[in-house]
């Protein structure tokens, strides 16, 4: 039996990538390292081309593409990044997760579904139809102050030595050896609480016990700043903080901008001050939906890069750049909807972003995971047009 080929080998031999011109080197590459190119782009400095990044793909999308020409060895997002030749980034650890998580328990198992309590403590019904649909949530682990004090807070202890047990010498060596942009997780201040409580419960708690919500946010802030600073002391340098919230729907956030500014903005400032202490002037938040009402709150707290800019929800990178100028950095912003339509629509969506990309600090890519209604041919054509327009 012949040895299985590596993903780079599959890429080099792939006929479809060659057909779409995706094996050719970047047309505007003048010798910057990946790190230099990323930093110059996000600092509004002259650059040969913008970095070539993408968000990722639904599992069902990759499964569809296997029937349309994508090698079956490419079966996850990391492998797809390598296969399509996207620019790499190095992520270093900061452990601010639960220690320990809840025990995973199957509470009920039928032909159609399974009811579980996951490692996150959430009781949920997970369907067996083979799709990655959102589970039906039944019960959340954080319902009141007693749950916070007895079940959740002990799992977030910043003094737990297990958080810091890493091969720091090896991590530091990888940072120094690879000329890649280096990112570190800076967690979440409100999105995590929503996950622990559920949307309706956290909305009610903001009114019924706002002191508890702020107490949790403060404790999480201490956990994040402590773990991030420890990691950076060990590693020495970082280029950006990578956060997550996902607290917006199509019509705006699940928390009022007033409360978000009161509770989160000054604490984001403490987190981003730690980043700046170690040379990182880029702080990104991953928030889907319509983020417009929260952008000022993030910017004032030092979170200056918005991602992934879901266009169909009303978050438009062109409008954000017009409003905020060089205060704001952008990543994403390519509406996924036209990718399922045709070449003309794909070209139009990318063309509308050219001037904003040229203005600096904007890395264009699909505004979320590529859904399974996008054909492989359409996606390759999208990559071809993006490469042509932006020199990738």
Question: Over which residues does each language-model region extend?
Answer:
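Segments that shape or occlude catalytic/ligand-binding pockets
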Residues: 62-103
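A structural signal for short, hydrophobic beta-strand segments that form beta-sheets
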Residues: 104-108
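Extended Gly/Ser/Thr-rich low-complexity repeat segments
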Residues: 124-138
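Active-site loop segments of alpha/beta catalytic cores
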Residues: 2-70, 114-117, 126, 139, ...
